[in-house]
Curated annotation (Swiss-Prot):
GO cellular component, one term: host cell presynaptic membrane
Sorted UniProt keywords: Calcium channel impairing toxin, Cleavage on pair of basic residues, Disulfide bond, Ion channel impairing toxin, Knottin, Neurotoxin, Presynaptic neurotoxin, Secreted, Signal, Toxin, Voltage-gated calcium channel impairing toxin
Domains as described in the record: The presence of a 'disulfide through disulfide knot' structurally defines this protein as a knottin. The cysteine framework is VI/VII (C-C-CC-C-C).
Protein name: Omega-conotoxin-like TxMKLT1-031
UniProt keyword Transmembrane, yes or no: no
Record-stated family: Belongs to the conotoxin O1 superfamily.
Keyword Signal recorded: yes
Tissue specificity comment: Expressed by the venom duct.
Disulfide bridges in this chain: C53-C71, C60-C76, C70-C81
InterPro entries per record: Conotoxin
Source organism (scientific name): Conus textile
Lineage: Eukaryota, Metazoa, Spiralia, Lophotrochozoa, Mollusca
Main localization (coarse): secreted
Length: 82
């Protein structure tokens, strides 16, 4: 019984995490699948669109490292670039 409850909680947590981390929460998982299909059609285009830094208001993983993750002129404060 305990194992079943733990499995249900784990599945719910992973589902919520996937929906929260999606770019557009209105589309949820549908948006993730459409991106994968587009990248398969033109893999070179997906490489060119990637950036090495985070834009303004994007998540940055470690505010104590300063502006290492944020684009030029932005600082990492409270886990987002500003």
């Amino acid at each position: 019984m305990k194992l079943t409850c733990m499995m249900i909680v784990a599945v719910l947590f992973l589902t919520a995490w996937t929906l929260v981390m999606a770019d557009d929460s209105n589309n949820g998982l549908a948006n993730l699948f459409s991106k994968s299909r587009d990248e398969m059609e033109d893999p070179e285009a997906s490489k060119l669109e990637k950036k090495d830094c985070q834009e303004k208001w994007d998540f940055c993983p470690a505010p104590f490292f300063g502006s290492r993750y944020c684009c030029f002129g932005l600082f990492c404060t409270l886990f987002f670039c500003a």
